[in-house]
Amino acid sequence: MQWEVTRRRAGVGGATMMTAQWWPWVEFDLVRRVPASAFSPAPSVDGGLMTTTRRSQELVPARDRRAYREFVHAAFTGRGKGIAQILGRLVPPRQRRHVNQQLGREGIAASALPKELTAEQWARLFVAYQEWGHGSMRRGSGARRG
């Protein structure tokens, strides 16, 4: 895999949506960089090695996989200047205070971007989101009704 893709998939410098969508069940670890000169013919970029390991303890139950991935997708593609605004659009107005409270408990800045969250933070936000009684996704807005 290309070095930069490997780094992003392993969450170095910020996670991709795909990484965040798999994190509750799989850990990604960067192993090493492989110089382009190690290949024949040599590509124009370095390669990278990484490992994927199934977590011994899931961060989110497998039965919630689809809902969790939809939640992460909505957060990564949602509008807003930070995670507080983005998640605030996913819940009914009366639940927005819960978003800010949960972010505070997690030590996540309101202005943080989705790529800056850890696997554990994503999992705990999802659990909290489920408890807020979000309802079903609204088309176009990425928001949920309550």
Residue spans for each PLM region:
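Class I S-adenosyl-L-methionine
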Residues: 1-116, 121-146
